[in-house]
Amino acid sequence: MRAKDLAIEAELKQSFLANMSHEIRTPLNAIVGFSNLLVSEDDLPDEEKADFINTINTNCELLLKLINDILELSRIESGNMTFSYSTCNLNNWVDSMYMTHSLLIPKEIEFIKEVPDAAFFINTDVNRLSQIMTNFLNNATKFTKSGYIKLGYEIDFSTYEVSIYVEDTGKGIPKEEQRMIFERFYKQDEFVQGTGLGLSISMVIAEKLGGKISVASEIGKGSRFTFLLPYHNESEEVFSAG
């Protein structure tokens, strides 16, 4: 059995390295190709030059994101991922996330925040929470062309859980793919740029924080990604503010 496990592990590592090499080559090829065109073609129109430069910049950002994600995976696998816990006012946190992403979401998409009237406090790693939800928001933005994107949270006082969610009216995810999207390097759409690592990393972070991620989606109607996080029952008394 041990030999079989080692063989499976070796196969997974080989597959990971092959995928990683492919994902790194793709933006590098674009950077090198368009850079060579800018150098070799003296009579390119200014508009075309600007397009090439923009493409190079986009692929540089993608490559940097890929490298950061790979480093994050390395920290996860070596057990060196660090967490710093503090008290988080969820209403203030949603406000901050809303302000940041309202600049990034296209104006034709309505960006909505949904929070309870009374602020609710939890003990968590705020940066890691933001990392998870930023991933959800980025994916919603990629796959939503009209309608809305919602960011918010709900409290279930009967189960002592907080549901922090991103909901969209995007293209939706086929049922058979809803588990696969959390696998490394999996992309729902090969024509949409991304590292294919974000949801895999988010899943691990969610588990390290003591929570879990779920997805509900319907083709043509949209998706809802939820981070479900337990809280201590004394939060109702100590951490709620009217």
Task: Place the predicted regions along the sequence by residue.
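Primarily the dimerization/phosphotransfer
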Residues: M1-S40, E61, L199
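Alpha-helical segment immediately C-terminal to the catalytic phospho-histidine in histidine kinases
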Residues: S40, L44-L64, N92
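Short helix-loop "hinge" at the ATP-lid/N-box region of the Bergerat-fold HATPase_c
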Residues: A140-T141
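Short conserved segment of the HATPase_c
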Residues: I31, I173-F185
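Conserved catalytic submotifs in the C-terminal HATPase_c
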Residues: S84-N89, E110-F120
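Helix-loop junction within the histidine kinase core
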Residues: S74-Y85
